């Protein structure tokens, strides 16, 4: 029950200069909700590696866009943007330095083709490429090496993730997989 007084008038705002650390030009995007996803990989009920299981499925069921000799490309089940691809070796290795020269070459070649196909099919304006190796580095599946290819557009960030805790993805994963797989060179 309110007594009618304006309690906001008594509130003070602490300036950023009062916090620990040295101010810099970087903005921070704090995502503590991702810790549940990151730490879930360490629990015993996650016995099957999703990147070892995917190639055993049909391309449609595994969301696989393309298969090479030593590596393959699939859609991220939890995409940052529509068309978010992952390039994985078939072998279950956890770090880039464990990859053979053949795997390194094919991961690189599949990444290049993936970028070209995404640019052609989605008209993206840029990419984020990267590998998070180890849970401490933010890898959701830290036991199996995978490279992210995230297509970017100048307008892909909006208020939804901040206000509504929702990421707007305009295409269903199956539709994206079909589009990219059909555009992939044979």
Predicted regions and their residues:
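HIT superfamily nucleotide-processing domains
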Residues: 1-186
């Amino acid at each position: 029950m309110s007594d009618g007084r304006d309690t906001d008038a008594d509130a003070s705002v602490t300036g950023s200069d009062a916090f620990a650390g040295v101010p810099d030009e970087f903005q921070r995007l704090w995502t503590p909700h991702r810790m549940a996803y990151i730490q879930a990989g360490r629990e015993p009920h996650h016995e099957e590696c999703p990147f070892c299981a995917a190639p055993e499925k049909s391309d449609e069921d595994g969301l696989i866009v393309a298969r090479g000799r030593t590596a393959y490309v699939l859609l991220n089940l939890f995409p940052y943007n529509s068309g978010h691809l992952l390039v994985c070796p078939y072998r279950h290795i956890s770090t880039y330095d464990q990859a053979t020269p053949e795997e390194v070459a094919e991961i690189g070649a599949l990444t290049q083709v993936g970028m070209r196909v995404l640019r052609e099919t989605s008209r993206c304006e840029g990419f984020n490429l990267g590998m998070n190796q180890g849970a401490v580095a933010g890898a959701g599946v830290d036991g199996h090496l995978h490279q992210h290819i995230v297509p970017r557009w100048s307008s892909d960030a909006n208020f939804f993730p901040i206000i509504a805790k929702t990421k707007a993805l305009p295409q269903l994963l199956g539709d994206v997989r079909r589009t990219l797989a059909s555009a992939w060179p044979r």
